[in-house]
Amino acid sequence: MRINVEDALFCLVDVQDKLYPHVTNKDEIEKNLITLIKGLKVLSVPFIVNEQYKKGIGETIPSLNELVKEYPHFEKTTFSCYKNEETIEAINATDKKVVIVAGIETHVCVLQTCLDLLEGGYEVVLVTDCCTSRKQNDT
């Protein structure tokens, strides 16, 4: 599949303070996410940043938050980002066809987001070297 940047949107999923220290390969994932985010910014791809229950899990980790602070942030209480009404409206308002997805935890929130986006008619690109979970088997 070829990605046209004019048709693409980036969805960052739950890379948050209180969860991130417990995931596998966190240093490598953080480095990869920084590289991905910087590259997508150069290409002017719009971003949506999602955070699961900020009161309990915290905000996006500082190294990434610094890079994405100007983009919309949406708090969610569902596993899927695409079950949150504000996120759905924001994604639909962009008229983008392709959603690039990265974040944590791969087997829950990232997976549910991808499945719901596919069901919603979007093409999904999962950046696997920018996804992780607490257990290696779930990554």
Q: Language-model segments: which ranges?
A:
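Short acidic, Gly/Ser-rich segments with clustered Asp/Glu that frequently serve as metal-coordination loops
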Residues: 17-22
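Active-site alpha/beta core segments
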Residues: 23-26, 30-112
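N-terminal nucleotide-binding beta1-loop-alpha1 segment
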Residues: 8-15
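Short amphipathic alpha-helices and their capping/turn segments at secondary-structure boundaries
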Residues: 1-4
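A short glycine-rich beta-strand->turn/loop micro-motif centered on a GG-aromatic cluster
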Residues: 100-103, 123-136
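Short Gly/Thr/Asp-enriched flexible loops that form oxyanion-binding sites at enzyme active sites
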Residues: 110-120
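Helix C-cap/helix->beta junction micro-motif
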Residues: 42-43, 120-122
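A cross-domain feature marking catalytic cores of carbohydrate-active enzymes
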Residues: 15, 49-52, 128
